[in-house]
Amino acid sequence: MSRFEEKKQLKCSFCGKSQDQVRRLIAGPNVYICDECIELCQEIIQEEFEENVEMDLVDLPKPKEIKDILNGYVIGQEKAKKALAVAVYNHYKRINTDTKTDDVELQKSNIMMLGPTGSGKTLLAQTLAKILNVPFAIADATSLTEAGYVGEDVENILLKLIQAADYDIEKAEKGIIYIDEIDKVARKSENPSITRDVSGEGVQQALLKILEGTVASVPPQGGRKHPHQEFIQIDTTNILFICGGAFDGIEKLIQKRTGKTSMGFGADVKSKVVKDIGGLLKQIQPEDLLKFGLIPEFVGRLPVIVTLDQLDEAALIEILTEPKNALVKQYKKLFEIDGVNVEFEGEALKLIAEKAIERKTGARGLRGIVEGLMMDIMYDVPSRDDIEKVIVTKDTVVNASLPTIILKDVKKDDSEETAS
């Protein structure tokens, strides 16, 4: 090679490789950088960025701040909100604190939530995930079965979380999973059975590892595992599991343990006992869950027990009107888009709440009741431009009739139409 050619040979100013040894060499003022060094720089910057994100996670909301935000979405359940705020704060504080070099090991604090249908269990879990800006997944325990039987494997729960995190495994490993209807996987009797209970005790056994913390292999497309399939590896150590259930009948086990009776001489009046179910649930102990049919190892992995109250009429009316996602506010907004005002009379709201209590559906049943009342008027309004206001009255709820309609540009005396 001539001296002139040697001078013309261009090299990367960072690694010293010549232009023949790399795919691309980019020139700057008297300097050159190759594609390999660009990739390396990108990796270094990405690592630093991720470290900064980790540091930002330390600034998670304090328990009081978490509870204040929950107040905007969930009515009542003050003790439950406080207990959840503390448990969630401690969980993420544990994740963000390096305790590997310490003598003290902070253990995982998964949560068990007990409360009647429609008392706000799912909403609380969803709102917590929203506050903390972490991936969130809901699973139904009734669809799960032990591996090898018809139904869903427990690993499919983790796949839902991975999908919620857009397949960002690192993000998913700090998410929240809510397992609903956990009381439905209680074993059929307190004594271990010889016959296999694939949808009860078998599911509890299968959940143990992921609740405690393990590196699980998840099929990327869901479904059953098979040997020729590649798996996604996910560490569940820092995933917060919240298990919820109605646990119907567990109050009788608590009554039996505490010595309170609702039969025979000295018995409480039945209505008083019903009202006191919430009070009984607050006295729950792990031994009551064992008698209900949960296995000791499973109960041990859910150390935080949170109980929710049965929602009364006043709470249901507040749920209809107060939270940011209140049904009345939602319907007002929907009609407002069509240029129509909506009003719900106080008596109507009271009757809607009473219906939800009768159906024993709690807050969850409110939407179905209101949707039924509003269906016909919501069908008519977009096709008409003469409606100014719609009023949902007591008669609307009692007789399932159309709400009162007030027309535009007509004298008030002549403008009220009440459909029979």
Curated annotation (Swiss-Prot):
Positions with a binding annotation for Zn(2+): C12, C15, C34, C37
Pfam family, one: zf-C4_ClpX
Keyword Metal-binding appears in the UniProt entry: yes
Domain of life of the native organism: Bacteria
Chain positions recorded as ATP binding sites: P116, T117, G118, S119, G120, K121, T122, L123
GO biological process: cell division; proteolysis involved in protein catabolic process
GO molecular function ontology, one term from the record: ATP binding
InterPro entries in UniProt: AAA+_ATPase, ATP-dep_Clp_protease_ClpX, ATPase_AAA_core, Clp_ATPase_C, Clp_protease_ATP-bd_su_ClpX, ClpX_bact, P-loop_NTPase, Znf_CppX_C4
Domain ClpX-type ZB: 1-53
UniProt keyword terms in alphabetical order: ATP-binding, Chaperone, Metal-binding, Nucleotide-binding, Zinc
Job description of the protein: ATP-dependent specificity component of the Clp protease. It directs the protease to specific substrates. Can perform chaperone functions in the absence of ClpP.
Similarity field: Belongs to the ClpX chaperone family.
Complex and partners: Component of the ClpX-ClpP complex. Forms a hexameric ring that, in the presence of ATP, binds to fourteen ClpP subunits assembled into a disk-like structure with a central cavity, resembling the structure of eukaryotic proteasomes.
UniProt name for this protein: ATP-dependent Clp protease ATP-binding subunit ClpX
Species for this entry: Alkaliphilus metalliredigens (strain QYMF)
Upper classification of the organism: Bacteria, Bacillati, Bacillota, Clostridia, Peptostreptococcales
